[in-house]
Design a protein with these regions (language model features):
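Residue-level recognition of specific faces of alpha-helices
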Residues: 12, 19, 44-47
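Alpha-helical transmission elements in cytosolic ATPase-linked domains
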Residues: 3, 50, 59-62
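Recognition helix of helix-turn-helix/homeodomain-like DNA-binding domains
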Residues: 39-53
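DNA major-groove recognition helix of helix-turn-helix/homeodomain DNA-binding modules
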Residues: 58-74
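Short basic helix-loop element that most often maps to the first helix and adjoining turn
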Residues: 18-33, 37, 62
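N-terminal flexible/basic segments that precede or flank functional cores
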Residues: 1-15, 75-83
Length: 83
């Protein structure tokens, strides 16, 4: 399997779970290694990569910050809700 460049990964950012998993694998880290480097528990990282929807934003940002990213608002292609 050919390794993807970081640029290719960035161009195809999908769910945060897939994004983190792809970057971790690109660096050749195990989940345990990345969790330790980011200062989060292995259980949290596993849940993040599995797409659990009830994770703490601060901890997700702690992992994303390791790669130079953070969560933030993204404009969606739909009509805004009534004010």
């Amino acid at each position: 399997m050919a390794r993807r460049t970081l640029e290719e990964i960035y161009e195809n950012i999908g769910p945060v779970s897939a994004f983190v998993r792809q970057l971790r694998k690109q660096l050749g880290y195990t989940q345990e290694q990345l969790a330790e480097r980011c200062g989060v528990g292995i259980r949290f990282l596993k849940e993040l990569e599995l797409g659990k929807t009830t994770l703490r934003f601060d901890k997700v940002n702690q992992v994303l910050a390791y790669f130079g990213f953070q969560l933030g608002p993204i404009k969606m292609e739909r009509q805004p809700l009534d004010e």
